[in-house]
């Protein structure tokens, strides 16, 4: 009931309360109820009850008239009412008979009301509809069938509670009223109210009785609840069991990857040649792959796929010069027969060029006049390759397992917590084409080591096949093991154990740097003590390494007992600055020496310390290492050497030093100083890879640039400073001049001299003015002035509005002999002194546009020179400011290439670089510094407000200093060059378009480029799949043209080349998951050649050559695929003729062009 109704009823029971014959002695304090609105229909009754003290309200002064009245509250109100009635506060005019009748009537009404309440409660308590029951039963069956879920029972219990929790909304009205209850008028009002409640209850009873046929009994529902409980119990049991079993499987799961590879191929050619160079280049400039490619990409050697022939069963390298059709095919080879019965091999095109060794006579009765032509044809007829492999890889799946028990003297607990195990091994039939026999066990392919496929019969590379009489083919099954890694915890501190072949590890730059190829079989243990109390805040770490090499360790001892071992400890005391100490050793032990009694035990021992990281806003790197090498030769002296450097400089994640980013800054960007480099170093001459127990040595990365630097990403060397070479020419005939190779280059020898030096580079911003400078001096480790090289320079820049003015001065003085070319182009060796100054004014009006004017002057050995002969680039600190306003970066490099000079003569796409997506054309600009002046203008497409987004171009005109004669000390600016280049990369609709071009014309030789006019233009288009076109075709094409009119003393000649190609791929061809593609490519060139990689990291390249040859290489490539079943076919032709049209295949394939065809079907099933 609502409190308003009770209040009104109680007030009516007071009827004539105002007619009391006596008033209280003192009026009680009447509380004010704050939530009874004025004008409410019950307000007067509420106020009367409050004034009588029957209702006092809640402690917060509220009445809460809309809130249900509890039995406790009703009891208090009735008790107060009875107390007042007992005290004589009764209505006037009521007789005893009236009071008795009123009491009886109230009792009757109360009894009827109670009876109705009981009936309603019974019906509601058992009121579960059949529909509800059916739905619940269906859900029970679903839960049981699906294995159950905990949420299902909770949902059922909620519905049960909802159906059975219909409590009585009305309390039984009890009115145990004494004889002096109230007046007849109040009783009448109370009766009306009670009658209304009775009518409401009767309506509810009727509704419930009418729907009783749809209800089920409580007993049925209880039975249903029992079934729910049973299902829940079974589901919980099953879930617990499955959870444990699944967790165990996941912890111990191997990823098993069986595969079956089937291939059938036919390949034949009259002479092996390369076709990879026809295909479009990848985005990074590497040669695109195809089904017939051979060879691979190797940054150590510079090898690319275009360096190897692609036909037959052999990966023949292409050969430079006439014997290899100038780098387009493998070489011609002859067997030379001598009268004494011996033979020799001659690699050349014309037997007449062969020079007979002294004392030998050619036997003209054999072969063709003493020469036997070695057949260059390559055949691979109907070869079927079937490979089966089974790989096992945990990929970290072993987790949270425990070790087993063990021990011989005692039994271990077997409770070591293993966090992770990685295993990678497998079984395979046949061998990969690049497998080799690692004879010396150093983990690298060395010259003279046989290929694995050529050694093991039936492994895929030999013609012989093992069969039994039933016709079964037998192939060897090889076990492949890559690594095993275990990670486990000791206490709260993780321990990582790595076990495997060719272990890779790194202690420091000059000690135990074996993170590239690896050192040998063994294991490493790393302990992280970050959770150790007290010292854990310093992040202590300990690493231990142990293994064996089974081969050379650099101390001339091969074969037995060569082991390496080392330990390193490291902490991080402040910021990110780490401090480490280490000890390492490698050598042959006594047992190994016993296998070779002529040798004595030897060892290499090195130890040191290092600091790396940043603290207090300064980045610091420093290392010290000392090494003792005891050779294996008896009585040989122990060699001791040291390496040390301390450097404030920024280091990148790949451990290369970034001298363009300040290592420390003082002040702000407007007024401040930036320190880019500050270093001291001393590397002893004897400190090499043997002394450091490292994979590779610490020699200069390049002989002609950055001589002080050892860092080499091609070999993984991270050491910053080199063990320098002193170059000296040889003089075999004692004529006082250097010996020379056939091409005129100097024959030189190198002697290690170590390095000791100091360097600094800094810059400052002073509002609109920026200044910077650098200085470095280095000698051999002994400090001798004969090997000193010093580089120094300063720069300044003033910028305001859209104008900027830059000036720089650079010097390089080298007493250390340098190999370079003099003004006549002859290679010389000796000391060198270079001076250069430059000034440039730039205007950047916005929209990405720029225009500038410059003057530059270069002096070599005291004489003004056309170029710096490439000498300034042999230092490592030379720097200059960026052009434009708002960019005061003091960047390494003299920016000599900014104004050099259009199209180059070397490229890797065959047409001047315009079809190489990795070339931004400025790559064609030489880094040589010239004596010149000129103007240049252009547009930067990456500018935020660029006039044309993604369009880059520049044009320029320059006058170049030319000496009067090659040896003259005077000259003038009679040389001239006009140049330009452009590049536009843009997505146009569904097509990705790249348009590039360059040109230059000069009347004088510029470094390696002769006088003349050259230019190149290229277009590459690749479309997305055309979704609304049948077969969803995808088109791609390229065309590039290069031309050069070279004016040289030996005679002018024109070189030109055209490269073209077009293809289409049908992505949905007839059947789902079926694709087919076809492309045609060609390359035509005149007076162009290809020089293969040099083996020292330099890639092969195309260049101009006055060889009077016309080369034509073209062919068709078709590839189709259904799912993973791939069909490939190619047919290609290589022709090289002289300018009169005579084929240079004379004596080879009867003077006809070389032709090659290949067909391949391959299918790989991954089970």
From Swiss-Prot:
Any Pfam family matching the protein:
SLH
Task: Specify which residues bind deinoxanthin according to the UniProt entry for this protein.
Answer: 622
Q: Which GO terms describe its biological process?
A: monoatomic ion transport
Which residues participate in Cu(2+) 1 binding? Answer: 274, 276, 305, 308, 310
Q: What happens when the gene is disrupted?
A: Deletion causes substantial alterations in cell envelope structure, and a significant defect in resistance to solvent and shear stresses. Mutants shed exterior layers of the cellular envelope. Deletion mutants show a significant decrease of the UV resistance, especially under desiccation conditions. Deletions mutants show large disruptions in the OM, but the S-layer is unchanged compared to wild-type cells.
| Signal peptide location | 1-22
Q: Which residues of this UniProt protein bind Cu(2+) 3?
A: 513, 515, 716
Q: Which residues bind Fe(3+)?
A: 438, 442, 444, 446, 449
UniProt topological domain (Periplasmic) ranges? 23-254, 404-416, 491-494, 529-540, 572-577, 616-617, 650-670, 767-768, 799-802, 844-848, 941-949, 989-990, 1024-1032, 1067-1073, 1123-1124, 1167
Q: Which GO terms describe its molecular function?
A: lipid binding; porin activity
Residue ranges in the Extracellular topological domain are 269-377, 429-471, 501-519, 550-561, 589-601, 631-638, 683-753, 780-788, 815-831, 861-931, 961-976, 1003-1014, 1047-1052, 1087-1108, 1139-1153
Could you tell me what reaction this enzyme catalyses? L-arginine(in) = L-arginine(out); L-lysine(in) = L-lysine(out); L-glutamate(out) = L-glutamate(in)
What the entry lists under PANTHER family is as follows: OUTER MEMBRANE PROTEIN ALPHA, OUTER MEMBRANE PROTEIN ALPHA-RELATED
What biological function has been recorded for the protein in this entry?
Plays an important role in the structural organization and integrity of the cell envelope, bridging the outer membrane to the peptidoglyan layer. Is a highly abundant molecule in the D.radiodurans cell envelope but is not a fundamental component of the S-layer. Binds the carotenoid deinoxanthin, a strong protective antioxidant specific of this bacterium, and could be part of the first lane of defense against UV radiation, especially under desiccation. Appears to be a nonselective channel.
Q: What else is known?
A: D.radiodurans possesses an atypical cell envelope comprising an inner membrane, a large periplasmic space with a thick peptidoglycan (PG) layer, and an outer membrane (OM) covered by a surface layer (S-layer).
- Name of the protein described by the UniProt record: Outer membrane protein SlpA
**Gene for this chain:** slpA
């Amino acid at each position: 009931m609502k409190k308003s109704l009770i209040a009104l009823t109680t007030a009516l029971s007071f009827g004539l309360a105002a007619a009391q014959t006596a008033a209280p002695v003192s009026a009680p304090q009447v509380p004010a109820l704050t939530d009874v609105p004025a004008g409410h229909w019950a307000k007067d009754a509420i106020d009367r009850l409050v004034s009588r003290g029957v209702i006092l309200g809640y402690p917060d002064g509220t009445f809460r008239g809309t809130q249900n009245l509890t039995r406790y509250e009703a009891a208090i109100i009735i008790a107060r009412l009875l107390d007042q009635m007992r005290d004589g506060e009764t209505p006037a005019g009521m007789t005893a008979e009236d009071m008795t009748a009123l009491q009886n009537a109230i009792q009757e009404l109360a009894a009827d009301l109670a009876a109705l309440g009981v009936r309603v409660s019974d019906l509601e308590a058992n009121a579960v509809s059949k529909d509800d029951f059916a739905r619940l039963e269906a859900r029970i069956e679903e839960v049981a069938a699906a294995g159950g879920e905990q949420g299902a029972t909770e949902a059922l219990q909620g519905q049960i509670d909802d159906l059975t929790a219909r409590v009585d909304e009305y309390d039984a009205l009890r009115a145990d009223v004494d004889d002096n209850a109230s007046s007849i008028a109040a009783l009448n009002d109370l009766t009306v109210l009670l009658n209304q409640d009775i009518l409401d209850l009767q309506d509810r009873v009727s509704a419930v009785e009418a729907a009783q046929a749809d209800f089920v009994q409580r007993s049925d529902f209880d039975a249903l609840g029992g079934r729910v409980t049973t299902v829940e119990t079974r589901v919980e049991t099953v879930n617990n069991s499955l959870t444990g079993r699944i967790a165990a499987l996941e912890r111990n799961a191997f990823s098993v990857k069986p595969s079956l590879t089937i291939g059938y191929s036919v390949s034949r050619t009259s002479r092996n040649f390369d076709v990879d160079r026809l295909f479009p280049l990848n985005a990074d400039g590497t040669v695109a792959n195809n089904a017939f490619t051979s060879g691979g990409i190797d940054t150590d050697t510079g090898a690319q796929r275009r360096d190897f022939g692609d036909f037959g069963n052999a990966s023949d390298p292409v050969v430079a010069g006439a014997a290899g059709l100038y780098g387009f095919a493998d070489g011609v080879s002859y067997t030379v027969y001598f009268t004494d019965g011996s033979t020799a091999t001659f690699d050349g095109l014309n037997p007449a060029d062969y020079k007979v060794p002294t004392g030998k006579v050619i036997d003209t009765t054999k072969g063709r006049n003493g020469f036997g032509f070695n057949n260059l044809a390559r055949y691979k007829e109907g070869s079927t390759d079937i490979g089966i492999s089974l790989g096992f890889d945990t990929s970290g799946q072993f987790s949270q397992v425990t070790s087993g028990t063990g021990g011989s003297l005692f039994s271990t607990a077997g409770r070591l917590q293993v966090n992770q195990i990685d295993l990678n091994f497998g079984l395979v039939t046949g061998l990969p084409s690049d497998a080799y026999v690692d004879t010396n066990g150093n983990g690298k392919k060395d010259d003279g080591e046989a290929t694995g496929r050529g050694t093991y019969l039936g492994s895929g590379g030999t013609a012989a096949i093992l069969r039994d009489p039933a016709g079964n083919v037998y192939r060897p099954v090889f076990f492949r093991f890559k690594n095993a890694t275990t990670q486990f915890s000791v206490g709260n501190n993780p321990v990582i154990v790595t076990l495997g072949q060719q272990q890779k590890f790194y202690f420091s730059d000059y000690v135990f740097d074996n993170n590239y190829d690896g050192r040998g079989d063994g294991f490493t243990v790393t302990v992280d003590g970050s959770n150790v109390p007290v010292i854990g805040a310093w992040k202590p770490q300990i690493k231990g390494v142990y293994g064996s090499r089974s081969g050379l360790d650099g101390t001339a001892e091969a074969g037995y007992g060569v082991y390496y071992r080392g330990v390193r400890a490291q902490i991080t005391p402040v910021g990110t600055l780490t401090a480490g100490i280490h000890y390492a050793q490698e050598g042959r032990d006594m047992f190994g020496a016993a296998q070779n009694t002529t040798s004595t035990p030897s060892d290499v021992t090195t130890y040191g310390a290092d600091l790396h990281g940043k603290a207090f806003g300064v980045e610091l790197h420093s290392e010290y290492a000392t090494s003792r090498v005891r050779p294996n030769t008896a009585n040989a002296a122990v060699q001791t050497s040291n390496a040390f450097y301390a450097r404030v400089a920024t280091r990148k994640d790949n451990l290369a030093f970034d001298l363009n980013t300040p290592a420390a800054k003082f002040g702000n960007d407007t007024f401040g100083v930036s320190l880019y480099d500050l270093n001291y170093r001393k590397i002893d001459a004897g400190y090499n890879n043997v002394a450091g127990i490292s994979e590779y040595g610490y020699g200069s990365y390049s002989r002609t640039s950055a001589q002080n630097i050892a860092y080499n990403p091609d070999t993984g060397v991270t050491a910053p400073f080199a063990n320098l070479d002193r170059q000296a020419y040889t003089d075999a005939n004692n004529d006082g001049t250097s010996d020379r190779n056939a091409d005129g280059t100097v024959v030189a020898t190198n002697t290690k001299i170590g390095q000791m030096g100091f360097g600094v580079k800094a810059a400052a911003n002073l509002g609109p003015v920026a200044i910077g400078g650098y200085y470095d001096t280095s000698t051999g480790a002994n400090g001798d002035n004969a090997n000193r090289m010093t580089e120094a320079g300063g720069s300044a820049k003033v910028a305001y509005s859209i104008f900027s003015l830059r000036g720089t001065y650079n010097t390089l003085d080298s007493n250390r002999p340098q190999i370079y070319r003099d003004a006549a182009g002859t290679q010389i060796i000796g000391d060198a002194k270079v001076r250069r100054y430059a000034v440039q004014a730039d205007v950047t009006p916005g929209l990405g546009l720029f225009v500038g004017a410059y003057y530059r002057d270069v002096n070599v050995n005291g004489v003004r020179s056309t170029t710096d002969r490439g000498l300034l680039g042999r230092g490592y600190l030379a720097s200059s400011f960026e052009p434009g306003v708002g960019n005061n970066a003091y960047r390494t490099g003299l920016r000599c290439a900014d104004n050099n000079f259009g199209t180059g003569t070397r490229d890797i796409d065959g047409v001047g670089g315009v079809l190489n997506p990795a070339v931004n054309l400025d790559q064609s600009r030489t880094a040589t510094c010239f004596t010149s002046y000129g103007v240049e203008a252009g547009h930067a497409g990456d500018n935020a407000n660029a006039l044309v987004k993604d369009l880059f171009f520049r044009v320029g005109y320059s006058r170049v200093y030319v000496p009067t004669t090659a040896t003259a000390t005077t000259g003038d600016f009679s040389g001239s060059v006009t140049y330009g280049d452009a590049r536009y990369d843009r997505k146009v609709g569904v097509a990705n378009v790249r348009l590039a071009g360059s040109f230059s014309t000069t009347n004088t030789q510029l470094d390696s480029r002769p006088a003349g006019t050259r230019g190149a233009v290229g277009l590459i288009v690749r479309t997305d799949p055309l979704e609304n076109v049948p077969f969803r075709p995808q088109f791609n094409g390229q065309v590039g043209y290069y031309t050069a009119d070279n004016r040289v003393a030996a005679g002018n000649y024109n070189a030109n080349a055209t490269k073209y190609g077009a293809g289409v791929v049908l992505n949905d061809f007839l059947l789902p998951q079926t694709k087919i593609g076809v492309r045609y490519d060609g390359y035509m060139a005149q007076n162009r050649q290809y020089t293969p990689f040099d083996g020292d990291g330099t890639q092969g390249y195309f260049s101009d050559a006055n060889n009077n040859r016309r080369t034509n290489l073209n062919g068709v490539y078709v590839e189709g695929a259904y799912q993973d079943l791939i069909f490939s076919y190619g047919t290609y032709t290589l022709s090289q003729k002289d300018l009169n049209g005579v084929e240079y295949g004379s004596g080879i394939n009867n003077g006809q062009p070389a032709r090659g065809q290949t067909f391949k079907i391959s299918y790989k099933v991954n089970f």
